[in-house]
Swiss-Prot record:
A Pfam family annotated for this UniProt entry: KARI_N
Catalysed reactions listed for this entry: (2R)-2,3-dihydroxy-3-methylbutanoate + NADP(+) = (2S)-2-acetolactate + NADPH + H(+); (2R,3R)-2,3-dihydroxy-3-methylpentanoate + NADP(+) = (S)-2-ethyl-2-hydroxy-3-oxobutanoate + NADPH + H(+)
Binding site for Mg(2+) 1: 189, 193
Needed co-factor(s): Mg(2+)
InterPro entries: 6-PGluconate_DH-like_C_sf (IPR008927), KARI (IPR013023), KARI_C (IPR000506), KARI_N (IPR013116), KARI_prok (IPR014359), NAD(P)-bd_dom_sf (IPR036291)
Gene that encodes the chain: ilvC2
Associated pathway: Amino-acid biosynthesis; L-isoleucine biosynthesis; L-isoleucine from 2-oxobutanoate: step 2/4; Amino-acid biosynthesis; L-valine biosynthesis; L-valine from pyruvate: step 2/4
The protein's name: Ketol-acid reductoisomerase (NADP(+)) 2
Length: 335
């Protein structure tokens, strides 16, 4: 595994160049501000609206996506996956010129062929492994978050060096930047989200909650046992792995972990995980998601509404009112 650190990258390669950050959401605002603090000239390309005004208030030169691409030597695409292909076709593609670098923080659109850059530009990825607010906060504290780096197309012969310079400007070389490929990053990222981090965990939490409430236990107690305390366990794993978590819990809980976990996540579960991975590898999920967006997201919206109305959500909202230390966001935002 090749990992790059501060001494392996030269942010000076970006001096005299302009970086265009396309999109000013969670990653956009974090990466743009970190780059600026590292002495890099940054412009923000967004359409008129809330993000435009926020970027302007943050002191950036804000312009249309087309103008930003024409202005910059490095173009970082930080729009949501489902918006990138349309914006690329409409405002980016015709404004690209020889020797520019097209950057991404997720490989979805390149790997699944939704964006096909011309052969005369570099195409690379710098993917911080943290949500934007942490990318920014940790940088301001003098540290950095780990990242992945990949080169899809090296037209200039310097793509990796420029990508590492960008990673250093964002602060990621302070922690370490691991070399990967667009394929590996995309497929593992989607699998982790679907089978473990999002799909797997939410299904497990709901199933546990429903099992207890259907067994006659009060919803409030079920919420505490199946969702609220999850953060305590995940924090222990985050800090020191499974061994640290098991060292920190009671022996009763640890024994229950060993004898029961494999009854819940069974061999059949793992077989289904492999089927999910195959669907991702073969592009079936990507096709499904692309078609869903083209159709106006009917399935997505229906499932989202149903999930928001689950009893677990209603109970949780009431219980969190008792917890003054939890600062629930007034407005839900994409991290």
């Amino acid at each position: 595994m090749k990992t790059y650190y501060e001494q392996d990258a030269n942010v000076g390669l970006l001096q005299g160049k302009t970086v265009a950050v396309i999109g000013y959401g969670s990653q956009g605002h974090a990466q743009a501000q970190n780059l600026r603090d590292s002495g890099v000239e940054v412009v923000v390309g967004v359409r008129p609206g809330k993000s435009f005004e926020v970027a302007k208030a943050d002191g950036f030169k804000v312009m249309s996506v087309s103008e930003a691409v024409r202005t910059a030597q490095v173009v970082q695409m930080l729009l949501p996956d489902e918006q990138q292909a349309h914006v690329y076709k409409a405002e980016v593609e015709e404004n690209l010129r020889e020797g520019q670098m097209l950057l991404f923080s997720h490989g979805f659109n390149i790997h699944f062929g939704q964006i096909n850059p011309p052969s005369y530009v570099d195409v690379a990825m710098v993917a911080p492994k943290s949500p934007g607010h942490l990318v920014r906060r940790v940088f301001q504290e003098g540290n950095g978050v780990p990242a992945l780096v990949a080169v899809h197309q090296d037209a200039t012969g310097t793509a990796l060096h420029v990508a590492l310079a960008y990673a250093k400007g964002v602060g990621c070389t302070r922690a370490g930047v691991i070399e990967t490929t667009f394929q590996e990053e995309t497929e593992t990222d989607l699998f982790g989200e679907q089978a473990v981090l999002c799909g797997g965990v939410t299904a497990l939490v709901k199933a546990g909650f429903e099992t207890l409430t259907e067994g006659g236990y009060r919803p409030e107690i079920a919420y505490f046992e199946c969702l609220h305390e999850l953060k305590l366990i995940v924090d222990l794993m985050y800090e020191g792995g499974l061994t640290n978590m098991r060292h920190s819990i009671s022996d009763t809980a640890e024994f229950g972990d060993y004898v029961t976990g494999s009854r819940i996540v069974t061999d059949e579960t793992k077989k289904e995980m492999k089927r999910v991975l195959t669907e991702i590898q073969q592009g079936e999920f990507a096709k499904k998601w692309i078609l869903e967006n083209q159709a106006g997201r009917p399935t997505y919206n229906a499932m989202k509404k149903a999930e928001q109305n689950h009893q677990l959500e209603k109970v949780g909202e009431e219980l969190r009112e008792m917890m003054s230390w939890i600062h629930a966001p007034k407005e839900l935002v994409k991290k």
